[in-house]
Amino acid sequence: MIYSVSDINERFQLLHRCMMKAVQRRRQRKVANAKRKTYRQRTKPELPRDKNPNYWQSPWGQLVKRLASIEGGPCISSRNGKLFRRRFRVPYQVYCKLVHMCLETKLFGENSALEFDIANRLICPVEIKMLSVLRILGRKWNFDDIAEATLMGETTARRAFHLFCENFVTHYYDAYVYRPKDQKLKKMMEVFSKMGLPGCIGSTDCLHRKWDKCPVNLNQVWSGKEGYPSLAYSCTVDHHRRILGSTSSFYGARNDKTIVRHDAYITDVRNKKVHEDVDYKIFIKGVLTTVKGVYYLCDGGYHRWSCMINPIKHTISRSDRLWSEWVESTRKDVECTFGILKGRWRSKKRYCATKSIIY
């Protein structure tokens, strides 16, 4: 097919007009995007961030310097000591001990003790990171709120908090949560013997903590008798409210009978692997009898095991009713422990926002 010169010119003009329209539309899109970007910058300005801040010039950095300048640290009964304990929920001496533990075992990571990182930027000091962890645990601050008082970024605060919780449990769980032996066990039994419960060394119960942001597809699995998704923990304490054993988190739909089967401490006591040689004397039908083994006080939702004594719910016997009232009046140690923890650390009192804060 042969085209004439006029046809060829007409086709070139049509192609040129199409190209010019495409270029014009592209220019219009650029102008519209520029206007939209300018509007976004005008309505939501981004504040410039100092990528190498001096953390010691922050409010909490000045606080650490001021308290460290006091010889021997602030006294617990002094104004500064009371103010520090009220704001960060622990005495200043305990805070110094935690800082020393973090430096010794590197709870905040391998580079936490260094002053500068590989890019020659100032690393946030361990003292300020420890204050941020205490504030999050004690007053349930958000991670972005920490930046206002420490000049520390939200990502750094989140990473420091999770590293501390994970590493602290790994290194120091056995140092604070351990099974009593010898003299300590005898002293614990003496306390309960004076209350009329020979052979008892503590009480156990389960704590259900609300999980607010539970996925919808897991609501039924994690919801129990409370009516909302929760995380269940089993805990055993003595009369002085020292924790003897605890478990990790379980589904909120599980009851106390199921959770206690996974408690290693209770299982060992039941199977006579620990405290099997401990003996005490009680009256059985008027005869003084020596019994071996120990037991714990619990509520009526547990198994009828010999190592777990609970009050009798339905009885017509006067002696059984008096025994149940006596046990109920002394079964307050584990409940008081939960109350003390919630009062000291507000992060335990409120709901659990994310599952990543479970250790």
What kind of feature is each model-predicted range?
Residues 1-116, 170-173:
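Charged, often Cys/His-bearing segments associated with DNA-binding zinc-finger transcription factors
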Residues 91, 132, 146:
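Short alpha-helical segments in extracytoplasmic peptidoglycan/chitin-binding modules
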Residues 115-119, 129:
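Active-site-adjacent structural elements in folded domains
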Residues 122-123:
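Extended, leucine-rich alpha-helical cores of fungal transcription factors
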Residues 126-139:
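Short, amphipathic alpha-helical "recognition" segments used to contact nucleic acids or chromatin
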Residues 142-359:
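Short, well-ordered secondary-structure "scaffold" segments embedded in the functional core
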